[in-house]
């Protein structure tokens, strides 16, 4: 669930960023929200690269397959 939420959040941030760059290019007023630096730092350090978290996902996946939930 949290992975889906983060993917949707990335899509929204990318969409807002492209809207802002198009507005700057066309000379119209920029209407997107600025993304705070703290949010960007938190997002860049998102724990998908953390080996402990990856190991946790693998264990969870193995348990789901063993119990028949992953079919």
UniProtKB/Swiss-Prot annotation:
Provide the free-text tissue specificity comment from this protein's UniProt record: Expressed by the venom duct.
Q: Where is the signal peptide?
A: 1-20
Q: Name one GO cellular component term.
A: extracellular region
Domain of life of the organism in this record? Eukaryota
Pro-sequence positions in this chain?
21-31
Q: Which keywords accompany this UniProt record?
A: Amidation, Cleavage on pair of basic residues, Ion channel impairing toxin, Neurotoxin, Secreted, Signal, Toxin
> What is a GO molecular function of this protein?
ion channel regulator activity
Tyrosine amide, modified sites: 69
> What compartments host this protein?
Secreted
The text of the family note is: Belongs to the conotoxin NSf-1 superfamily.
Q: What else is known?
A: The mature peptide does not contain cysteine residue.
Q: Please explain the role this protein plays, according to its UniProt record.
A: Probable neurotoxin with unknown target. Possibly targets ion channels.
The molecule here is called Conotoxin Pl071
